Amino acid sequence: MIRIHKDKYFDSIYDELLEQATQEKYMDEYLLEKFMKRYFNGKCSYCEIRMKELRLTIDFYRPINGSLNTMDGEFHPDHYKWLKNEDDNILSICVECKRAKSNRFPVDGDVASINADKNKLVKERRLLIHPCRDYPERHFDYDESGMVYYKSKKGEVTVDVLNLNRGMLVEMRAQVYSEFNNLCYLFSMEQSPYYLKQILQEVQLDSIFIGLKKFILSEWVILNEKIPFLQEFEPLLGKRLQEEEVRVLSVRNNKISQIDIDNNILYVDNDKRRKRVPARKINDYYDVSDENALEKYYGKQRFIEKIEIYNFKSIRNMKIDFTLSKSSNAPWLMLLGENGVGKSSILQAIALTLMGNEQRQKIIKKKPYEYLTKGFDEGSIKIKLSGMQEPISIYLNSNSFEFTGENHQRPRVLILGYGSTRLLPREEMLSNYKVTWARIENLFNPFIPLVNVREYLLSLNNEDFNNVKKAIESLFLDEVIIDRDQIYEEVYFGFANSYSKLEDLSDGYQTIIALATDIMMVMKNRWRNFDAEGIVLIDEIDAHLHPRWNIEIVSRLKNAFPKIQFIATTHNPLSLRGLIDGEVAVLLENEEREAYITQKLPSQKGFNVEGLLTSKFFGLYDTMPDLNELFDRYYLLLSNPSPNERQKEEIKNLQDKLSKYEKVGTTLREQKFYEAVDYYFAQYRKNNVELSDEEFNNIIEDAIKYFER
């Protein structure tokens, strides 16, 4: 991270772009790219990754749709809406920093009052570094492994909130460290103008990781004493040094000679400087159940990044990458495959590793060796969580009667798990609503029911009831209003033309309602709003669902719980709707009947998954709920043998819209073929009967004649 110097105000040509950002709408990519290059050097303001490596978008330094103060876990729903048009509050951000930052804004002490002006905002003891107001170089050091280390409280909080030591960044920084360090070495050996030019090119504002490069350069100039403090370096290193050091270096630089270089002159009191370099240790410890360590819990967003499973049940050796999704919200992963290939085993492996020792002893009745793949004596599960350097590990041994491992004793995340059988509770069952961090019993025991929705909703205070009901209402396909009558102890669901009690709804409705309520019941132990964070595992997400809801379920859950990481399984392709590239993995079996996973699947751009559904994985056709209305209107117009001019124009407009989703062909050849096929389907839909072979052949012949002209 480096200091960014930008214009105080943005050009008015970007007003529409910034308005799109405030409303979280799709932004014009061309304008966005120009905006990023002009004001932010084409890089993320925080991690310095370039737009050619990762997609950039617009960030609001102080979040404008509610703010979570990570220092105390308090959510402020009305902060900082009044700053949405303040240019000083707008920065560039990559999708991964945006996902980590979310609506976090750490403040030491009281947050500013609603509608506070700049004079009052300045008094907020903000702990997130502002690249345009602070000097980030003073807060960070680096090493050859690519890790970034903080030198201040602000530095520590910023590293945590933005997850600046995430795997991809560490790997990229390590490579840049090696290359730039080698360049400095070559310059120190030869003092060649060529290498000096190379160094200066590497620290141009649009170059990657300038903060890291400035650190390396300062090490060579100041600590290693191999490179003189040249005039060209003063604007680069000035903010990393104390004023006295800059003055001393500048004075001595005027007296420099080749003899001085050869004799390796000592430029500053390095013993004094070394004392300022902190002990390089990252404190990963935190515990979701520890009331005295909530700052550490709220300070980082934690998702599963990677998992390695070795000799667990039917899985011999499997690695899964959860970082392929580039969503700015929580990443999903849908495990797709036939029954018996190990989908459920993956969910159980995750739950077993993350639930914490207390829940493991309470829920898991099997011994560790009973989970081993038949014929093997050792196994393991390793999960890498974002924000943690070391994985959480569980070891399985044929001689062990207790689960062993590393970092697995305490719960690190809120986690819920549901098996393929999700029973509703019977009235006579005793309810248990005590605080819990892991609710995964149903994943291991199908007879453990979901929450008693009516009883639970009636038990909530008004604030909690309103939060839970909003989440449930957002899952329904039709508009619904949930209400309760605490005198008569009933919960009602008001639809457009009916008013029903919970027990009068269909089993599918009741199951979805119970699932959402179950999730909220656990999440509210740490979170007070819809931005709850955690991990939810669902086996056979399509179970009990009507096909229409099946198509919508992912989008609905993403909307209701945008910050929760869902890992689900299905063998129904309709459940893929709402997922983006990197959020689907297919489980298959090899010739030895061993399960393996593939995540290299056709792109889901515009959610065109026809290639997947007609591939060796399925061989089914696909439907897009977003486009149903377009297709309905398109086929209706095509079914008219003599459309008027207005209808012809509408057909052309619909074809243009469908072309954006590559639904009417991308070449002239494809377009004529699609026209023939669409005409066929239009007649079929109109008459509800198939065209004869002769009629269909005539359509194809017309298309052929077109190319013969």
Swiss-Prot record:
GO terms for molecular function: ATP binding; ATP hydrolysis activity. Transmembrane segments: none annotated. GO terms for biological process: defense response to virus. It comes from the Bacteria. Signal peptide: none annotated. Disruption phenotype: When this gene is missing the Septu type II system does not confer resistance to SpBeta in B.subtilis. InterPro entries: AAA+_ATPase, ATPase_AAA_core, Bact_Antivir_Def_Nuclease, P-loop_NTPase. The keyword Membrane does not apply. Keywords: Antiviral defense, Hydrolase. It holds the Pfam family AAA_21. Component of antiviral defense system Septu type II, composed of PtuA and PtuB. Expression of Septu type II in B.subtilis (strain BEST7003) confers resistance to phages SBSphiC and SpBeta. May be an ATPase. This is Septu protein PtuA. It comes from Bacillus mycoides (strain KBAB4) (Bacillus weihenstephanensis). The gene is ptuA.
